[in-house]
A protein has these predicted regions:
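Short, conserved, GDST-rich strand-edge loop motifs in beta-rich repeat architectures
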Residues: 114-131
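Short coil/turn segments that connect the beta-strands within blades of beta-propeller domains
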Residues: 16-18, 64-65, 109-111
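Extracytoplasmic beta-rich repeat domains
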Residues: 1-13, 41-64, 89-104, 148-155
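Short loop/turn segments that connect beta-strands within beta-propeller blades
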Residues: 32-35, 80-83, 138-140
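Residue position within the beta-strands of beta-propeller blades
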Residues: 21, 69, 114-115
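Extended catalytic-interface subdomain
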Residues: 134-155
């Protein structure tokens, strides 16, 4: 599943007899839970600027007919759980400014919630950047809200 030297720590997601996994090379897979046979594989995005990805990938989420996964370069994907086809892809944080992900999304009250790592690395001169948690519409990937976890000037 993973050819890179980065840590591979996915928490499997099992739904209706299918096992879903993601790895540090941003490859999302669906396996038959009984036989282990590969059902589909989606290469979401190649790891960006860092050989072998940017660290461990830990979890993905499912809601209705989609699997949700964030890649190591801070893109959030909605993927059709049955076919493995990408339905939507949104940039949550700019990886060029230090954002990335090692923990995936969760779904709460019909919203896909995603935090970022890299708050300690983002470029301080960028006034629009900071530490945040975001919520997205599971059907479209549209940003619903963003909450700054560290108050910025004026907040």
């Amino acid at each position: 599943m993973n050819d890179s030297a980065a840590a591979n720590e996915p928490t499997p997601l099992i739904h209706d007899g299918v096992l879903y996994l993601i790895n540090t090379d941003n490859i999302l897979q669906a396996l038959d839970g009984r036989t282990g046979d590969l059902i589909w594989e989606n290469h979401l995005r190649p790891p960006k600027n860092v050989p072998g990805g940017t660290g461990a990938m830990r979890n993905i989420a499912i809601y209705q007919d989609k699997i949700f996964a964030e890649t190591t370069d801070a893109h959030l994907f909605g993927v059709n759980a049955r076919t493995g086809q990408t339905v939507w892809d949104v940039m949550v944080g700019d990886s060029a400014k230090g954002y990335g992900s090692s923990s995936g999304p969760i779904v709460i009250r019909g919203k896909v919630i995603q935090g970022e790592n890299g708050c300690d690395r983002y470029k301080a001169q960028e006034k629009d950047q900071g530490c945040f948690i975001s919520a997205f519409d599971p059907a479209t990937g549209k940003l619903l809200w963003r909450f700054n976890t560290i108050a910025r000037a004026g907040e």
